């Protein structure tokens, strides 16, 4: 019988995110669990089918292979030498399944039945979580303490994370005999995979806890205080150990990773620890020179001296007025870039004065003189 589409099995679309795939699997696992469908002879097969689908779609590499090739990506017999006896190829009867299982997982997919080896019946660590946090440049400069709300799974207090109703205990998984692993022979290799029935836990729950539906964990938003040090930039990662998802069956929690994004600022641009600020100045100020006042990222004011005859794009430096270094050391600098502004909406008198000034400044614009001299030479050469 043809295998069903894995996305269809989990009730999600092909464009579903990893979170949507996880939610779809949890929903199907609760709905199809054999212990909750004892009168349905198809429940166990459908439950295994959902586990098989999730094993592929939760893994980015396997998902990519499935999206491209479908079920054919995980069929056996994909090339290699021929004729070897089962378990042979390396001599001495060694079991290389653990060494090669990660490599061949991507080739051969899920296997049910077969032998098993140790590894089940143990607690498992919870997943790591990612939280994207946007802050402004001022906060990145000074650092701050911020409270965030993180949706995550925590250990169920009703069953203390066991997943079993009070007075009952999980029982050994019949598929893997409590080992959490199943093996299958593929030509030369013995390939080991996580048991699809118990998801590697080695146990199944006949009387699931009503609070967590047998998951051993419940969804809850948590308020966490995060210390953001001065000098962070976009891409900085902050690790909060043990603040990820709760582990299964009393296992340790995963970690929470805070990824910082520093928002763009209306006045300052950042390059490492240096800051850049573009400051407009009048033609008169640029020509005559003088002192101007500029803002600094700490909310203060700085003064820079503009040399006479300054052009647009000229930069001046305020040392130590940039961003602090994240891991210590001296702060960066702040660079002031001049933007000489041409006046608009001139009065008649202003136009007269500018026209008079232009007549008197024939020898005061060396760049213009050089440019038009080059233009004249170019035209003369074209005539020849």
Swiss-Prot record:
CDD domains: DnaJ, DnaJ_C. Binds 2 Zn(2+) ions per monomer. Coiled coil: none annotated. CXXCXGXG motif repeats lie at residues 156-163, 173-180, 195-202, 209-216. InterPro entries: DnaJ, DnaJ_C, DnaJ_domain, DnaJ_domain_CS, HSP40/DnaJ_pept-bd, HSP_DnaJ_Cys-rich_dom, HSP_DnaJ_Cys-rich_dom_sf, J_dom_sf. It holds the Pfam family DnaJ_CXXCXGXG. Residues 5-70 form the J domain. Keywords: Chaperone, Cytoplasm, DNA replication, Metal-binding, Repeat, Stress response, Zinc, Zinc-finger. Residues 16-47 are annotated as: Disordered. The keyword RNA-binding does not apply. Its cofactor is Zn(2+). The keyword Zinc-finger applies. GO terms for biological process: chaperone cofactor-dependent protein refolding; DNA replication; protein refolding; response to heat. Zn(2+) 2 binds at residues 173, 176, 195, 198. A zinc finger (CR-type) spans 143-221. It comes from the Bacteria. It is found in: Cytoplasm. GO terms for molecular function: ATP binding; heat shock protein binding; unfolded protein binding; zinc ion binding. Zn(2+) 1 binds at residues 156, 159, 209, 212. Residues 31-47 have a biased composition (Basic and acidic residues). The J domain is necessary and sufficient to stimulate DnaK ATPase activity. Zinc center 1 plays an important role in the autonomous, DnaK-independent chaperone activity of DnaJ. Zinc center 2 is essential for interaction with DnaK and for DnaJ activity. NCBIfam families: DnaJ_bact, PRK10767.1. Participates actively in the response to hyperosmotic and heat shock by preventing the aggregation of stress-denatured proteins and by disaggregating proteins, also in an autonomous, DnaK-independent fashion. Unfolded proteins bind initially to DnaJ; upon interaction with the DnaJ-bound protein, DnaK hydrolyzes its bound ATP, resulting in the formation of a stable complex. GrpE releases ADP from DnaK; ATP binding to DnaK triggers the release of the substrate protein, thus completing the reaction cycle. Homodimer. Belongs to the DnaJ family. This is Chaperone protein DnaJ. It comes from Roseobacter denitrificans (strain ATCC 33942 / OCh 114) (Erythrobacter sp. (strain OCh 114)). The lineage of its organism: Bacteria, Pseudomonadati, Pseudomonadota, Alphaproteobacteria, Rhodobacterales.
């Amino acid at each position: 019988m043809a295998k069903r589409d894995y996305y269809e099995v989990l009730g999600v679309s092909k464009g579903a995110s990893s979170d949507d795939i996880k939610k779809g699997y949890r929903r199907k696992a609760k709905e199809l669990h054999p212990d909750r469908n004892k009168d349905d002879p198809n429940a166990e097969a459908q439950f295994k089918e959902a586990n098989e689908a999730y094993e592929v779609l939760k893994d980015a590499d396997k998902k990519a292979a499935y999206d491209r090739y479908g079920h054919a990506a995980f069929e056996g017999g994909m090339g290699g030498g021929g004729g070897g006896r089962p378990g042979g190829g390396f001599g001495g009867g060694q079991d290389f399944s653990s060494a090669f299982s990660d490599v061949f997982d991507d080739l051969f997919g899920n296997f049910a039945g077969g032998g098993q080896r140790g590894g089940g019946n143990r607690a498992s660590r919870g997943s790591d979580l990612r939280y994207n946090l946007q802050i402004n440049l001022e906060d990145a400069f000074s650092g701050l303490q911020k409270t965030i709300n993180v949706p995550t799974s925590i250990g169920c207090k009703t069953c203390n994370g066991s997943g079993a109703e009070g007075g009952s205990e999980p029982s050994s998984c019949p598929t893997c005999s409590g080992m959490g692993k199943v093996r299958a022979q593929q030509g030369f290799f013995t390939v080991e995979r996580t048991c699809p029935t118990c998801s590697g836990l080695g146990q199944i729950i006949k009387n699931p806890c009503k609070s967590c539906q047998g998951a051993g964990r419940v969804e809850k938003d948590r308020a966490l205080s995060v210390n953001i040090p001065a000098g962070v930039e976009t891409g900085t990662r902050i690790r909060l150990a043990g603040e990820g998802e709760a582990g299964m069956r009393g296992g340790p929690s995963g970690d929470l990773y805070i990824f910082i994004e520093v928002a763009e600022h209306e006045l300052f641009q950042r390059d490492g620890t240096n800051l850049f600020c573009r400051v407009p100045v009048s033609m008169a100020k640029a020509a005559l020179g003088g002192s101007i006042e500029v803002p600094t990222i700490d909310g203060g004011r700085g003064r820079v001296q503009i040399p006479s005859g300054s052009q647009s794009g000229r930069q001046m430096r305020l040392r130590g007025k940039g961003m602090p270094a994240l891991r210590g050391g001296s702060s960066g600098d702040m660079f002031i870039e001049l933007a000489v502004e041409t006046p608009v909406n001139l009065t008649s008198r202003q136009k007269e004065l500018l026209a008079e000034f232009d007549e008197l400044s024939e020898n005061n614009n060396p760049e213009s003189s050089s440019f038009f001299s080059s233009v004249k030479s170019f035209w003369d050469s074209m005539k020849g």
